[in-house]
Amino acid sequence: VSAEYLERQGPKDDXDCFDD
């Protein structure tokens, strides 16, 4: 998971859609 993704999505509340 990239930092940019974390900044956009925040904490994983949607499940493990992206485990990259």
From Swiss-Prot:
| Keyword tags | Cell cycle, Cell division
Q: Is Cell cycle found in the keyword set? A: yes
| N-terminal signal peptide | none
Q: Name one GO biological process term.
A: cell division
* Origin superkingdom: Eukaryota
The UniProt function text for this chain reads: Possible 'checkpoint' protein for cell division in the blooming process.
The protein's name in its UniProt record:
Blooming-related protein 2
